[in-house]
Design a protein with these regions (language model features):
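Beta/alpha (TIM)-barrel catalytic core signal, keyed to glycine-rich beta->alpha loops juxtaposed to Asp/Glu
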Residues: 57-251, 261-273
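Active-site mouth loops of central-metabolism enzymes
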Residues: 18-34, 62-66
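A short, structured active-site edge motif that brings together acidic residues
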Residues: 1-8
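Surface-exposed, active-site-proximal loop segments in enzymatic domains
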Residues: 9-27, 158-161
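Active-site groove signature of glycoside hydrolases
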Residues: 39-63
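Short, acidic/polar
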Residues: 29-43, 94-101
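Outer-envelope exported proteins of Gram-negative bacteria
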Residues: 1, 51-53, 90-92
């Protein structure tokens, strides 16, 4: 599985200009898209790509008509699938509404929503997951640990004291949820990563989870956690109740907030930020 959106070779300079130039030709040029596909084949040493996706389809440089699921990139993916160069075509990104709109077109086989679910919230269940179920689209969740949000990886109650003074009600909901999540971790003896991985497994609509890891040991731990299967019904029910406590900051805002607050933890021992 791979994606297009970071173009290779002579397209690289053109991509660098897209911050200022939203109609960059690389994103609507099927010749350059084919170059990206062929390069991926070479890197993967495969004659056929199992899944080929559009990276961040909400980027304006793709010039996609979301309502009607039209655009040069979509046309290219459909043609590549017809020609047998790819088996399945998909989407990956952060904008769950845009992903939902495109999934509803029935043109796609696969979607990877980044940061769309954690122990705190699961916004992809508002619109995206129902659309995927309706249209038979496979889901690979990206970043269930909150995109390396430290208080979702390491149970350190000092984070609660750092978050409590913040007046945003969405942050206070995070505190309320973390208190119960940490208590559940204490009661079950399960680490936050294991709770997360097995909680996601409880959701049959999600085919796989791209958890991410910084060390080989993390990969081994994640595999071991997944091997234990879904959480027991009572533990799952408690996490579902925690989800209902209230709206939280979006996960990317929480991640960025944690990067600011971590400087106040002189002896923080969790994952690297």
């Amino acid at each position: 599985s791979t994606k297009m959106g970071y173009f290779e070779g002579t397209v690289r300079e053109e991509y660098a200009n897209t911050v200022r130039q939203t109609d960059a030709k690389a994103f609507v040029d099927p010749v350059k898209m084919m170059r990206a596909l062929k390069h991926s084949m070479w890197l993967l040493q495969k004659d056929v790509i199992d899944i080929f996706s559009i990276h961040e389809p909400d980027w304006p440089q793709w010039q996609i008509d979301y309502e009607h699921a039209r655009g040069a990139a979509i046309d290219f993916l459909l043609e590549a699938k017809r020609e047998g160069l790819v088996r399945s075509i998909g989407l990956g990104g952060w904008d769950y509404h845009v992903l939902s709109q495109l999934v509803k077109s029935g043109k796609f086989d696969f979607v990877l929503p980044a940061g769309g679910m954690s122990l705190l919230s699961k916004p992809i269940y508002d619109e995206l997951i129902p659309a995927c179920v309706q249209h038979g689209v496979g889901v690979a969740l990206g970043g269930g640990f909150g995109q390396n949000t430290p208080f979702l990886i390491t149970k350190d109650r000092r984070w609660l004291e750092l978050l409590r003074p913040l007046e945003d009600e969405r942050v206070q909901n995070v505190v309320r949820k973390l208190e119960r999540i940490y208590r559940l971790s204490d009661e079950t003896g399960l680490s936050l990563p294991e709770l997360t991985i097995r909680y996601i497994i409880n959701h049959e609509e999600i085919a796989t989870h791209v958890a991410g890891a910084r060390e080989i040991a993390h990969i081994r731990q994640n595999v071991e956690s997944a091997g234990r299967g879904p959480l027991a019904p009572d533990v799952f029910r408690e996490l579902e109740e925690i989800q209902k406590i209230g709206e939280c900051l979006p996960i990317w805002d929480l991640r960025d907030l944690s990067r600011k607050l971590v400087k106040k933890l002189a002896h923080y021992t969790g994952g690297k930020i």
